[in-house]
Curated annotation (Swiss-Prot):
GO molecular function, one term: sulfoquinovose isomerase activity
Broadest EC class assigned to this enzyme: isomerase
Keywords: Carbohydrate metabolism, Isomerase
Organism: Salmonella typhimurium (strain LT2 / SGSC1412 / ATCC 700720)
Catalytic reaction list: 6-sulfo-beta-D-quinovose = 6-deoxy-6-sulfo-D-fructose; 6-sulfo-beta-D-quinovose = 6-sulfo-D-rhamnose
Gene: yihS
Annotated protein name in UniProt: Sulfoquinovose isomerase
E.C. numbers: 5.3.1.31
Positions annotated to bind 6-sulfo-beta-D-quinovose: R55, Y111, N172, H176, R238, E251, Q362, Q379, H383
GO biological process: 6-sulfoquinovose(1-) catabolic process to glycerone phosphate and 3-sulfolactaldehyde; carbohydrate metabolic process
Subunit structure: Homohexamer.
Catalytic-site annotation from UniProt: H248, H383
Listed InterPro entries: 6-hairpin_glycosidase_sf, 6hp_glycosidase-like_sf, AGE/CE, AGE_dom, SQ_isomerase
Length: 413
């Protein structure tokens, strides 16, 4: 039974994409895009986060290029938000979180700034007249504060004034830097962004994870030595969980395959390890995290022996898994990846997709019942594009540039 690149399956994906786009519209607040609750309501107590606002700018840039009425207005809103309350006019960059009363968290976070870069680059593909100016400014901030020429890797965070940085390096922030760098390359055609993405992947995946059974280290010191016991006392941390976060392993795999395709599109020979390590990450994620306790679903985190730590099933790992399955199938034509893709969609429609309240549940417990141990509410809709839109596109260019170029369903029959 074939789903990939069939018009019938792609039509179903498109219907679900529109349902998600419509849910996300509820996130509009004066300061950007807010944190969505389980029924699509704004959770005002959470404030307006840079990472959510930037991700929603990215999402509605894709929607605008798909011809969705009203989406361009949301792109405009997102750009104004990025130039508004979230932006630090004194020291530069963006605050981590604001609300209607002012700044809630003035720190300058790499993770959040890389989403600012992704959102700005995606907005450029819509033709918005202010998007390129926003991208140029964001690149300036990244170059000055978050890309380390000495380390050839990305820094984690700064204080408000960009005067002190952490003695910590994060795999999560660097992974999302790779994601953003790929899209920046697509809109600027500056090869250095691909070179940087390749460098980051080579350190975190090829040098470290490959030699550890593809269990990806998330936490490093400033010399890029893994810190294996980081947050052992706070294992369910949303952004810096203890141990391995298998959803990131499989997400890394997809990003490396986009990088592989981007290099091929330049008529360059990609390093063979990009594909081989992507396969290794995919299978390691299934080995350690899929149904280890008997019930279907990906556990949130595992220890260094692959045993579950936080058994909750958060939605984004399985969403990323489906995108990676498609990417691996595209490059290998191996039917096992489509079989996993279909199995995971069956799981999602059974447990995660919420047709009563909208969007998808963010988190399930070990028995696949709705819970809120790690996440509260449905936040945003960014990850969902990776199982809804990416399976309808070639692997290069990246998501927003490919949609803007009219490449949706180009291979569908």
């Amino acid at each position: 039974m074939k789903w990939f690149n069939t018009l019938s399956h792609n039509r179903w994906l498109e219907q679900e994409t529109d349902r998600i786009f419509n849910f996300g519209k509820n996130a509009v607040v004066p300061t950007g895009f807010g944190w969505l609750g389980n029924k699509g309501q704004i959770k005002e107590e959470m404030g307006t986060h840079l990472w959510i606002t930037a991700r929603m700018l990215h999402v509605y840039s894709v929607a605008a290029s798909m011809g969705r009425p009203g989406a361009y207005d949301l792109v405009d809103h997102g750009i104004k938000a990025m130039n508004g309350a979230l932006r630090d006019k004194k020291y530069g960059g963006w605050y981590a979180c604001v609300n209607d009363q002012g700044v809630v968290d003035a720190s300058k976070q790499g993770y959040q700034h890389f989403f600012a870069l992704l959102g700005a680059a995606s907005a450029v593909t819509t033709g918005h007249p202010e998007a390129r100016k926003l991208l140029d400014y964001t690149i300036e901030v990244i170059e000055k504060y978050f890309w380390s020429e000495e380390e050839q890797m990305c820094l984690e965070s700064w204080d408000e004034a960009f005067s002190q940085t952490e003695d910590y390096r994060g795999g999560n922030a660097n992974m999302h830097a790779v994601e953003a760098f790929l899209i920046v390359y697509d809109v600027t055609h500056d090869k250095k962004w691909l070179d940087r993405a390749l460098r980051i992947a080579s350190v975190i995946i090829h040098d470290v994870a490959r030699n550890g059974d593809y269990r990806v280290n998330e936490h490093f010191d400033s010399q890029w030595n893994p810190i294996r016991d980081y947050n052992k006392d706070n294992p369910a941390h949303r952004f810096r969980a203890y141990g391995g976060t298998p959803g990131h392993w499989i997400e890394w795999g997809r990003l490396m395959l986009h990088l592989h395709a981007a290099l091929e599109a330049r008529f360059e020979t990609p390093p063979a390890w990009l594909l081989e390590d992507a396969k290794g990450l995919f299978h390691a994620t299934i080995r350690d995290a899929w149904a280890p306790d008997g019930a279907d679903g990906f556990v949130y985190s595992v220890d260094w022996d692959g045993k579950p730590i936080v058994r909750e099933r958060v939605r984004w790992p399985i969403v990323e898994a489906m995108g990676t399955a498609y990417a691996l199938y595209t490059l290998t034509d191996d039917s096992q990846y489509e079989e996993w893709y279909q199995k995971w969609w069956d799981y999602c429609i059974k447990y995660l997709m919420d047709y009563e309240n909208g969007s998808w549940w963010q988190e399930l417990d070990a028995d696949n019942k709705v819970t809120t141990k790690v996440w509260d509410g449905k936040q945003d809709i960014y990850h969902l594009l990776h199982c809804l839109v990416i399976p309808r596109l070639p692997l290069a260019p990246g998501l927003a540039p490919a949609v803007a170029a009219g490449l949706l369903d180009i291979n569908a029959k």
